């Protein structure tokens, strides 16, 4: 034993220094590895009385850490190790948990139960070192926790008014942190911190809800106000520019002033300048005395409580909810707010789409947003610019007057049989016999020919052009009247009437198309009235001249009327749209210059025509007749056909064609020719009354009034003729037929005269409007032929009273048709009407806005 001890002691004297160096290196390396792996250093309180231990209770068994000092290799160094450990306590490491505070020692629960070694020394056993996968997972958790904290802080940060709250919140957080550091009860501290965070989130989101909902509501009211101001500002601007054009000494000065005006208007229309959001939120009353400000704008500024009241109610509802429901509502609100607050980038594009539906027909007079497609395919706002040039009216008046003279010829030809048939059946005047059947064909063949002309007119205006097609009817009108004037038999009269009716069918289709493609929208309503007015003038002229002339002289007058029409048609150009359709861009530009004025900028309008033509070419390959048979197209087409049916079967053309004969059969005490003149004057004046009321009272109201007036007068006329034939003497009531005819014509001209033609252009879908209008026009001429051809036969078979009662019964049925099926289109854009009829919207062409040629025939 002593020898072993001496050898050990002697060996220890030489080996103590290497072992001490090794333990120092071991301590440094373990400390460094523990810091890198996120381990926590724990100092063990060792008793100096512990005299024996083994190195394997201190060192990990991994030889990677220190292979040179393994207890298995050097068991003789155990005693020396015990002596060294009396001066230097060992190290113990464990994983750092998420709940640990690096500034505080571990709790009793976190410390492991010490294991007793072979001696009396108590040491904490070391866990095995973590693997590389565990190290990566631990670092990932730390990064995710840091990112989550950063994201939570960014979500809770608000703008503007919340800065002060965050400062107070920072102070409260520091106070709570100090209190938590001083608190020894960790669970109590966590409860306080959680409660504070919930209170902060609630108060912050209440403020956010109130502010952002105010912002959203203010934007809605602001968009409505801007939509109104677009119209008012541009109207004022247009008048200003018109006055400036008259007063300007030079063109350069005018354009310079116009550019300055557009710049000021661009600023005034900018939402950030015209309608500050803080005025609504703060309830500013500084603008209360400004003149000319919109009433809605004032109400929003002076009564902000109207906006915030529903928001406060919603906040009270939120406060009454449970914590879970409130958190759900808050999350939903945050999702909405992330969309609504990005207003600077998206607000204008959204407003453009919304205002397209609101502005409707007013888009011509407003200052619209102009979109430009960028390289990435997204639309962006480029500039504001006006849509129209200053109106150069005189050339457009000349164009409208030229085609309206053709309408005068149409009206004269249509009313020819009413005064002419009386003298034509008189054997003392006519050299040939005209039987009752032949007389019915003289009146009825013109509508039949008009049906054929309407069908042929569609291809002709596309092949020859609008102007050339109208011009081509002038010579046949002259020939037809000369053929009737020089007739020696009924066949010549019928040939002349057929040729005249064929030209009437072509003209009635081409005249509205020409006006719609040449006249600017600002004057289209006024100039669009000229064909209707001139058509009724032609009817009145025929009635007045027929009271002094026989049928032959009246026909010679009809041959002279187309001459000024023929001359003026040579002075006006073809429509620009037709030139664009033929690829003649330069000729289209010249036509626009003639119509709009030499100084006008016609390039924007020309580009619009080219885009419309491109859209039409893309749809040209479709079979339009098959499109008519689709269910969503049949409804508007059926309504249009129904209105045409009730218009003609009200008996209007029978009354116009046979007015003199009706008054002669009635035995009226008033001269028949004078009665026709009075009816013509009423027809002419009633047209203007209908134009004034049609956009004020509405379409359906006027149809109701028109139908009721016709039903009453037709039944009264039927009763008069019945009493004259079978009943008591009514000779003392000779004024009654004229009174009934005046009321009948007045009622027809208010409603069933112009409205079926107007609604045909409104309710028919854009893609089938051309073909559907041709079908409706042809059907109208067919009904006209049936009524005029069978009227005299009806009076023979049923008596005059039976014919008028039949027409009255049909009008009575038409009243229910209007009530049930006809929609109200007053004040609605063509897009809105089509959306209601078909459930979708497309861009409408300018031709769709015209009022078709309409006069009583």
From Swiss-Prot:
Source taxon at top rank: Eukaryota
Record field: transmembrane: 393-413, 441-461, 474-494, 498-518, 529-549, 553-573, 637-657, 674-694, 701-721, 741-761, 768-788, 802-822
Pfam family, one: Sugar_tr
Listed GO MF terms: D-glucose transmembrane transporter activity; transmembrane transporter activity; trehalose transmembrane transporter activity
Tissue distribution: Expressed in perineurial glia of the outer layer of the nervous system that forms the blood brain barrier (at protein level). Expressed in the fat body (at protein level).
BP-aspect Gene Ontology terms: D-glucose transmembrane transport; transmembrane transport; trehalose transport
Biased composition (Polar residues): 69-81, 171-181, 330-341
Phenotype upon gene inactivation: Pupal lethal. RNAi-mediated knockdown is lethal. Pan-glial specific RNAi-mediated knockdown results in severe locomotor defects. Pan-neuronal specific RNAi-mediated knockdown is viable with no defects.
Main location as per UniProt: membrane
CC terms in the record's Gene Ontology section: membrane; plasma membrane; vesicle
The entry's keywords: Cell membrane, Glycoprotein, Membrane, Phosphoprotein, Sugar transport, Transmembrane, Transmembrane helix, Transport
Regions of this protein lying in the Cytoplasmic compartment: 1-392, 462-473, 519-528, 574-636, 695-700, 762-767, 823-857
Bias type Basic and acidic residues, positions: 134-143
PANTHER family assigned: FACILITATED TREHALOSE TRANSPORTER TRET1-1-RELATED, PTHR48021
The protein, known as: Trehalose transporter 1
Species of provenance: Drosophila melanogaster (Fruit fly)
Gene field: Tret1
């Amino acid at each position: 034993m002593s020898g072993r001890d001496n050898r050990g002691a002697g060996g220890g004297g030489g080996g103590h220094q290497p072992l001490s160096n090794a333990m120092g290196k071991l301590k440094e390396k373990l400390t460094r590895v523990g810091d890198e792996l996120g381990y926590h250093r724990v100092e063990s309180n060792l008793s100096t009385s512990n005299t024996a231990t083994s190195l394997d209770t201190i060192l990990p068994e991994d030889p990677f850490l220190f292979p040179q000092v393994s207890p298995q290799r050097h068991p003789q160094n155990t005693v020396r190790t015990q002596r060294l450990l009396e001066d230097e306590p060992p190290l113990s490491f464990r994983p750092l948990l998420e709940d640990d505070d690096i500034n505080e020692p571990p709790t009793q629960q976190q410390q492991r139960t010490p294991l007793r070694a072979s001696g009396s020394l108590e040491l904490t056993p070391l866990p095995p070192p973590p693997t590389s996968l565990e190290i990566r997972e631990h670092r990932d958790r730390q990064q995710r926790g840091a990112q989550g904290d950063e994201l939570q802080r960014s979500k809770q940060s608000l703008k503007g008014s919340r800065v002060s709250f965050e400062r107070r919140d920072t102070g409260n957080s520091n106070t709570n942190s100090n209190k938590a550091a001083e608190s020894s009860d960790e669970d109590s501290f966590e409860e306080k911190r959680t409660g504070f965070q919930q209170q902060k989130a609630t108060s912050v989101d209440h403020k956010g809800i109130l502010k952002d909902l105010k912002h959203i509501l203010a934007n809605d009211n602001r968009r409505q106000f801007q939509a109104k101001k677009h119209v008012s500002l541009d109207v004022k601007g247009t008048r200003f520019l018109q006055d400036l054009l008259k007063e300007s000494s030079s063109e350069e000065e005018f354009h310079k002033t116009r550019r300055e005006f557009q710049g000021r208007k661009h600023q005034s229309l900018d939402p950030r300048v015209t309608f500050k959001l803080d005025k609504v939120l703060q309830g500013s009353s500084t603008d209360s005395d400004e003149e000319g400000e919109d009433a809605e704008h004032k109400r929003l500024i002076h009564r902000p409580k109207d906006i915030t009241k529903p928001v406060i109610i919603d906040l009270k509802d939120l406060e009454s909810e449970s914590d879970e429901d409130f958190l759900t509502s808050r999350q939903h609100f945050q999702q909405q707010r992330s969309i609504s607050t990005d207003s600077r980038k998206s607000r204008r594009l959204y407003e453009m789409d919304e205002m397209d539906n609101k502005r409707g027909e007013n888009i011509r007079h407003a200052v619209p947003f102009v979109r430009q497609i960028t390289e990435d395919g997204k639309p962006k706002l480029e500039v504001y610019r006006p849509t129209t040039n200053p109106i150069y009216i005189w050339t457009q008046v000349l164009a409208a007057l030229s085609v309206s003279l053709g309408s005068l010829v149409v009206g004269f030809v249509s009313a020819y049989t009413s005064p002419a048939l009386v003298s034509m059946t008189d054997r003392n005047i006519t050299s040939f016999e005209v039987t009752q059947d032949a007389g019915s064909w003289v009146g009825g063949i013109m509508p039949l020919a008009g049906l054929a002309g309407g069908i042929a007119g569609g291809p002709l205006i596309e092949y020859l052009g609008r102007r050339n097609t109208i011009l081509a009817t002038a010579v046949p009108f002259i020939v037809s009247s000369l053929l009737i004037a020089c007739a020696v038999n009924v066949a010549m009269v019928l040939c002349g009437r057929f040729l005249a009716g064929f030209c009437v069918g072509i003209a009635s289709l081409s005249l509205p198309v020409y006006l719609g493609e040449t006249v600017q929208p600002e004057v289209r309503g006024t100039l669009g009235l000229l064909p209707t007015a001139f058509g009724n003038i032609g009817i009145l002229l025929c009635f007045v001249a027929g009271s002094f002339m026989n049928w032959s002289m009246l026909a010679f007058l009809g041959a002279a009327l187309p001459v000024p029409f023929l001359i003026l048609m040579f002075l006006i150009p073809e429509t620009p749209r037709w030139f664009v359709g033929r690829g003649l861009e330069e000729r289209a530009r010249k036509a626009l210059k003639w119509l709009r004025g030499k100084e006008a900028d016609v390039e924007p309008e020309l580009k619009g025509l080219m885009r419309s033509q491109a859209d039409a070419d893309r749809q040209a390959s479709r079979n339009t007749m098959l499109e008519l048979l689709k269910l969503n197209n049949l409804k508007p087409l059926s309504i249009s056909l129904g209105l045409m049916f009730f218009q003609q079967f009200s008996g209007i053309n029978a009354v116009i064609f046979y007015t003199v004969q009706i008054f002669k059969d009635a035995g009226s005490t008033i001269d028949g020719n004078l009665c026709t003149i009075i009816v013509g004057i009423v027809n002419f004046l009633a047209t203007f009354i209908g134009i004034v009321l049609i956009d004020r009272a509405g379409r359906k109201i006027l149809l109701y009034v028109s139908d009721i007036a016709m039903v009453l007068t037709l039944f009264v006329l039927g009763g008069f003729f019945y009493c004259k034939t079978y009943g008591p003497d009514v000779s003392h009531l000779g004024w009654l037929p004229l009174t009934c005819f005046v009321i009948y014509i007045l009622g027809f001209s208010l409603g069933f005269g112009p409205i079926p033609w107007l609604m045909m252009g409104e309710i028919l879908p854009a893609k089938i409007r051309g073909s559907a209008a041709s079908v409706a026009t042809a059907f109208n001429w067919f009904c006209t032929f049936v009524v005029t051809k069978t009227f005299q036969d009806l009076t023979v078979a049923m008596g005059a009273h039976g014919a008028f009662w039949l027409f009255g019964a049909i009008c009575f049925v038409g009243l229910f048709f209007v009530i049930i099926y006809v929609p109200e289109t007053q004040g609605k854009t063509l897009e809105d009407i089509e959306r209601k009829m078909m459930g979708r919207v497309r861009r409408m062409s300018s031709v769709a806005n015209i009022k078709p040629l309409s006069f009583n025939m």
